[in-house]
Structure formats: structure tokens, C-alpha cells
Amino acid sequence: SFTVYENADKLEKEMLRVAPEDGREIKKFTADIKKFSEMHPGAAETGIFEKASGFLKIIPALISMIKYAVMDVRKFKKRFKNPFLSLAMGKIFGNIEEFTALGLVFTLAWMHERNAGYPVGGSLEFINSIEERYLQLGGEVFYNSAVDKIIVEDGRAAGVKLNNGGVIKADTVISAADGHKTIYDMLEGKFKDKKIDRIYSSFRRFPSIMQVSMGAAMDFAGRPQSIDFPLDKPITAGDGVNDRMSLRIYAFDKTMAPEGCTALTTYLAGDFEYWTKLRVNDKKKYDEEKKRIAAEVIETVDKKFPGFGKSVEVTDVATPATYERYTGNWMGSFEGWLMTPKTMLTKIPDTLPGLKDFYMIGQWVMPGGGLPSGLMTGKEVIKKLCGLDGIQFTVNKP
């Protein structure tokens, strides 16, 4: 077994326990984690880069950044001689070995500094707190109002047309929606150039996946938050074969299940075209396949934790088609652009050629995906708008 600790010193000790022969490489790695922890997302706003002493302090980290930026996880894990440690380092972000090593080290660095982690209540609770603050400041939210088209008048974005026929006029339009849908559907592909076409035709997306969620009347208190293990019997999902399982155990989050119960999830490889076509052409088989996969996952977990199968009270299976229907995300991807050496070295524009008063934010302009990318890129756009209006950007804490 191998435990990934958020504290770099504990992580180093664990890595040395597993692979003492990789001691030199391990100590270099954990030293870089500590160096990178000085460069947290809000570092620029603390003034660290403005002071000579602060800038000199992060020079070693900047040099290391270049090294990791051009290296993917597949290459990074080969630095370790121990086969098990090499395998484990390649699994921290699932099976996505094209992921840049820079993203791996930064994530561990922010966790070491306790500037990143899991929000209790999950993403919904996280975004609910943002919405609450937005409403306090006078904002409005329109639910069940999907945008069909972005209204363009005289070369500027002037509002949005909803799929229910409604129209909302605006001085500025900011899209946090799916990038492909925004550019090629909502704007009908009228505002793009060769660079944008190249990005959307060649950049790697996060893969489409299946998510199996389970609620069990079994207490997993004290168990690891996540475990990854090989399968004796592979699970076939469409044309994808899964020979390992990464199981997320939410016993640490008491909001996810009643007392004495636990919520668990796992992700499986899933082909978008297969599941989308199956849902359209044979809904009965689509539903049957979801039930079969859920049953096989439960059976697999039961072998790991005897009695689990009988304790499961609720299941939910989301296919790539589900992701696309609920989120509109292109090709059912569970996030946006994958953080690869290529995407990390490319500046993705947040504006479109020939269109004024329009901006894009989120995971299609900042590789890596997730809610933080929406907040970080959104904040930068608001700063730009404040500058255009001659207003100083300030943050008022509630």
C-alpha cells in the first residue's frame, strides 16, 4: 500500500518507506513541493513578486517550474526505479499520464501549504456559498434558462437568447459555458481564427467517463479517502475495459450520508459516441448496461469489503451521455482542457476576434478544469472591466 499525504514531510517519509532505493529522487521531489508552496494562487496579490526579497525567494521554484512544465506524468514516474512507487505516482491523477507533471507538483504543494483540499459538502456546497454572496451583492440567477444564442449587434455582444424564447440584454456577455458550444453554436462559428480552430481540433480534453455512485448502510470511518487496486475480473463498459478501480470513500464528509452510512464513487472509462448512440438507438439496452455495470462494481467492492453488496441502498450511474446532457460539456468530457506540456505553454485567449464586449472564463481558457478555474479566470475578467470603467478593483469580505 501507499498513502499520499498532503504534508510533504509525511509524503517523503512514506515514499522512502516504499522505495528507499529512490531516496535521492524522492528528496528532490519533496523539496520542489515545498519550493512550489511559496507560489500559491494568491501569491501575486500578497505582493511577494513586487519585493526584491520575495522575488529572489521564488527563483529556485521558477527554475524547477520549467523542468516540470515540459514533462508529463508518464515521463515523470520513470524517474523512480521502484516499480510500485513509479506505478503509484502515475495513479495520483487516475490513469491520465498525459497530465503535466507541473500540475501534479503544484497540487501537492498547495495541499502542503493547506491552500487546497476538499470542500466539505462537495462542489454543490462550494458553489452555493458563492451564489449566496453573489445574491447578497445584488446579483440575479435565472435557473432552467439555458442559453441558445449570444446576441450580436454591430460587432458587439449585446445579450443572450434563451432556449425558452426569452431574451436578456446586456452591456457585456461573459460565457462560463462549454467553450466549443459557445464559439461554434451560440456564436455560430462567426468569431474565430486559425488559432482557435487549432486549439479545438488538437488540444487534449479530459476524457469522457462513467461515474458509479453508491450509498451503503455501512460505516467506513477510519478507512482511506481513496483506494486504487487491480481487478481480478476486468469490468467492460461499452468498448472500454477497466482492469483497475479507484474508489472514493466519503466517510470523511458527514454531509454525504446519514450516520452509520457512507457514500462511495468510482470512475470507469467511457466512450462518448458509444453511450450517446446507445441511448438514442436502444434506450432499453442503455438502461440494462447501466444496471449491469453497477452490479459488477458493487460485486467488486464487496470482495474488498465483505458485506458491502447487501448494504447498498441506492446507486446512480452517469454515462458520458449523462455528462453531456446535464452540463453541455463537449463530448461528455468531465472537465475542460487537459493540463499537458502543450496546453500549459499555450496562451488561450479569453476574447474572440471581431467581437467586442465579450469574454470567456472557466476551464476552456484555463487548462485543468474544475470550479477554481472559473473563479480565477472570472476574477481576471472583472479586473479588466473595472480597468475599462476606471474603477479600482477591490474585494469586500462578508
Protein language model features and the residues they cover:
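Dinucleotide-binding Rossmann-like beta1-alpha1 core, especially the glycine-rich loop
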Residues: 1-35, 61-62
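Active-site/ligand-binding neighborhood in enzyme catalytic cores
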Residues: 34-137, 144, 326-341
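Mid-domain catalytic core of redox enzymes
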Residues: 148-259
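Active-site-proximal substrate-binding core of FAD-dependent oxidoreductases
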Residues: 152, 386-398
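A conserved FAD-binding loop/helix module that cradles the flavin
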Residues: 363-386
